């Protein structure tokens, strides 16, 4: 697949869990990239994500930008030594709407991950999602393991579950 060669040569694609599967990607599959609404606008750090989505789209692969309307209310613990200051729901929503508008201006399909959770209560979540989560696996993730020594809130621990489901 020419797009894989292109992304590899550009240094964008480095590690792929299953290269053969990626090379034979189903035409109905989608590749997504996540955007965190903790800032009012997209920033330079998002540039590679956007260009990669556009390159994949141009190569005929369906792409999707997922904006974290749900995960943005929690805050990503990755690469943090302390817990993020939580934004108000209004701030997250304002940021999310701005970022969605910016992504759509590139012609990128956008999905808000809040749609997965907005009508789900905690008991439904634990039954539907919690029963399939391996806590030992999560504790071994670098983003979690590094924070355990200094303290990690349940909110931050749950971020990975909400992001991944």
Predicted regions and their residues:
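NTP-dependent nucleotidyl-transfer catalytic core
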Residues: 1-165
């Amino acid at each position: 697949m020419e797009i894989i060669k292109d992304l590899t040569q550009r240094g964008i694609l480095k590690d792929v869990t299953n290269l053969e599967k990626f090379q034979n990607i189903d035409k109905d599959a989608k590749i997504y990239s996540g955007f965190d609404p903790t800032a009012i606008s997209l920033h330079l750090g998002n540039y590679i994500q956007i260009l990669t989505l556009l390159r994949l789209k141009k190569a005929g692969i369906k792409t999707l930008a997922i904006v974290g309307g749900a995960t943005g209310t929690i805050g990503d613990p990755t690469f943090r030594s302390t817990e993020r200051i939580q934004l108000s729901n209004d701030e997250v929503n304002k940021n999310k709407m701005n970022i969605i508008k910016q992504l759509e201006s590139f012609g990128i399909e956008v999905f808000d991950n809040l749609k997965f959770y907005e009508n789900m209560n905690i008991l439904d979540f634990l039954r539907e999602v919690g029963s399939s989560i391996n806590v030992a696996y999560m504790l071994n993730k670098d983003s979690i393991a590094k924070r355990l020594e200094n303290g990690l809130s349940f909110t931050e621990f749950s971020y990975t579950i909400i992001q991944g489901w």
